[in-house]
């Protein structure tokens, strides 16, 4: 009887949810004058329903089924606009659409609009990631760093181990991130200091509207990047309603709120707490991570021409070691992994003034990172003699950017200035073994003042058949005399695009980009208190790319792009002869060593992508990247494969929406085998060497001479949504590596703890060594639940 009652209630529950429809409301304004536009046709893309705006620019579309949609706005004399994606439910936000007047229109010429965004400054190497992909990408668990890995040129960490962004053969330290124009230093918990990767994303997907992902052709107002820029656009709070959403994700629980404070200010706020520590303990893993994060956005529109956005993002990370488990694998990891504690936050504000064809903005922000690592030999904290690493490092940056954008008919000019004051402090005790044991014991207090200028001019032909963009940027700082000279870091760039025939575009870009080495390198000291890396230069990369893109219809795009990157003045490690760019894909810190700017590198290849979008039905994409990544020591050295030289990356990802709000997604990922370096058995077996770092040393004379097999995995995701008049409930099942594919890794060399020659002098004593077979690859299921009221 209980089963009958339960099934009856479930049936009624589903029937009430099915067939629910909603209303979409918003306003359309002139982008320049900020005045409302009347008689604009607004359509829900893919549904064929819509409405027109009234004298106040207001529109309302009734009877819209729940889901994720774009809007299309069109009007004679204005460029047709496709909006970002919006979720339509009981709390669909008020949507504001900005339309731009068309320039001088040639008689008889029709300009065809498309949802696939192309901009004059970045006609190649730019992808816009929408809400559908962020919410439902299989295997990503709503983590934007993993969503990006579906795109051409981006390598991925098998079995979802880490979120390092490896773009077009570049290192994980070569990326920059922006939230609504505010730069943030990293987007991951437990981030590797000196790089950008980590195991879990820091940004709650519930706050994201879309992401612009640049794998090249960076805008002039986005500096200090060599491989990629991720430009996040956050949602605005709802000016009509207040709502609350709870989410149980793969690794955390989250609570988000969205609404308004008065009639001029909207807000978004999110708080998340992980339960990984409990989960990892149950699974018997040797590390116990826990994290908390919070983020917010406040936006105030004072009037039609002035607005202020305040936002914040912060995280607290704690990683303990689990000594309650046994086994050789656990023994190995516990032997070298330090305890890690991190706190990070960014607070920023953007003031924007609209003055007709001119828009001025002022962006002010402050970022903070406090990173602490602690390690004792054999994890024995009973004596300070066992201490091998104690690090406390703090990075702080205060940034000011002022810019103006002016539009005149077919031309657009953007220009501005940046100022940056950075403080870096470090207290380090570290035991290191080269040919003998060395102790680095130093304190750093480094202040760096940075400045930059940028400008770009865009042109678009009246029929939009041809576009061009010319930009320049230059940066400097007071770290050393060479870096002060702006002309040394002059960074020109040029982009062009030409429509060969209807919907077929040929585009190209060339540019020179610069990036400052990490603070960990700039602040590294010797025991005598002197800065050992004072002669470092800015790292530079010249990039060239050319691409073809074809849009058979408004729902489909096929593209191919070739790229070439050449690096100069790459920091090279004095101790092992490896560029800093080849490090940073593991926990800890990189850059805190003696470096010289003598390495060069190159990466080149071809990317192909197919994308097919059918609103509320299908989101399908496929990408293939074939590339090579190499470096050398100086102009006369031989090229050696870099750590990121996987040779190929292949992805197919799709999500299909079934009736009654069911959706199923699948992703197939394949990547070429990673290179690895054999161990230096002689050095690793020395007692003093092993005790210094707790793991084996590589034989860098044979750097990257071995390659692992290629790897592939299949991820599946199933979603079910329930919609009612005043609330929404959703559940999803995400399964990574559903076929349990095995990832082959090099055998690990480790000490048995037994000394084979105990009577020898200490410097000659050796451990008896053993090898542990390394192979991972398990099915990783995750259940997620969301409820919004």
Give residue ranges: language-model regions:
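Transmembrane beta-barrel wall of Gram-negative outer-membrane proteins
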Residues: 249-273, 285-319, 338-361, 366, ...
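Gram-negative outer-membrane beta-barrel transporters
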Residues: 460-466, 564-566, 587-678
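Periplasm-facing N-terminal accessory domains of Gram-negative outer-membrane beta-barrel systems
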Residues: 18-108, 119
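C-terminal beta-signal and adjacent terminal beta-strands/loops
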Residues: 568, 620, 670-694, 709-713, ...
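Periplasmic N-terminal accessory/gating domains of Gram-negative outer-membrane beta-barrel systems
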Residues: 79, 85-87, 112, 116-218, ...
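Flexible loop and strand-edge segments within Gram-negative outer membrane beta-barrel domains
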Residues: 276, 307-354, 360, 368-395, ...
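Surface-exposed extracellular loop regions of Gram-negative outer-membrane beta-barrel proteins
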Residues: 188, 324-329, 425-432, 502-544, ...
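Outer membrane beta-barrel strand-and-loop segments of large Gram-negative receptors
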Residues: 391-393, 397-403, 441-454, 533, ...
